[in-house]
Amino acid sequence: MSFPRVGVLALQGDTREHLTALREAGADSMPVRRRGELDEVDALVIPGGESTTISHLLLDCELLEPLRARLADGLPAYGACTGMILLASEILDAGVCGREALPLGAIDITVRRNAFGRQVDSFEGDIGFAGLVDPVRAVFIRAPWVERAGDGVQVLAQAAGHAVAVRQGSMLATAFHPEMTSDRRIHQLFVDIVNGIA
């Protein structure tokens, strides 16, 4: 089996942790900060951070439209927390005028930013995850949740009555941060998706 080259958008967030988790899951991983680097990867992880900031960094780095184009052409992507927000087709509470989070439109979901509350309301807990025998330890930090999932979207996990992990084809998104634990099953799932075996 080949080792896919999976990029991690390295504008903000847990870049190093995702790079390590991807390597441990069997991928060749690299940071992506420029368009040329985006062109080199077989798949992309969009890490957590602050969604309006990352949106505007994508604009400043002239990555927003090239990323939208690659996603539309079928680039597999995994978004964690902010990554889930950005991969969505619609964002509720997107921010103030001129500083909104900009949806990439890769997954047919509507997400609500900061749905679980502010930074002080962050928490972690064990949740069931479709296809995995044992629960996943999920770290939620100012996390979103899914308000609406389209017909082609599979809900993989729920918390507090809302979807917090979804998949649509080769797109995967979680409201939580698996890179902050030693459990590599979510990253392994994404690598398997990229390799066409999940």
Swiss-Prot record:
Q: What UniProt keywords are attached to this protein's entry?
A: Glutamine amidotransferase, Hydrolase, Lyase, Pyridoxal phosphate
Positions annotated as active site in the UniProt record: 81 (nucleophile), 177 (charge relay system), 179 (charge relay system)
Regions annotated as coiled coil: none
- Positions binding L-glutamine in this chain are 49-51, 113, 141-142
Q: What is its EC number?
A: 4.3.3.6, 3.5.1.2
Give the record's GO biological process terms.
glutamine catabolic process; pyridoxal phosphate biosynthetic process; pyridoxine metabolic process
* GO terms for MF: glutaminase activity; pyridoxal 5'-phosphate synthase (glutamine hydrolysing) activity
The family note in this entry says:
Belongs to the glutaminase PdxT/SNO family.
How this chain assembles, per its entry, is: In the presence of PdxS, forms a dodecamer of heterodimers. Only shows activity in the heterodimer.
- What's the protein called, per UniProt? Pyridoxal 5'-phosphate synthase subunit PdxT
Organism (species)? Mycobacterium leprae (strain TN)
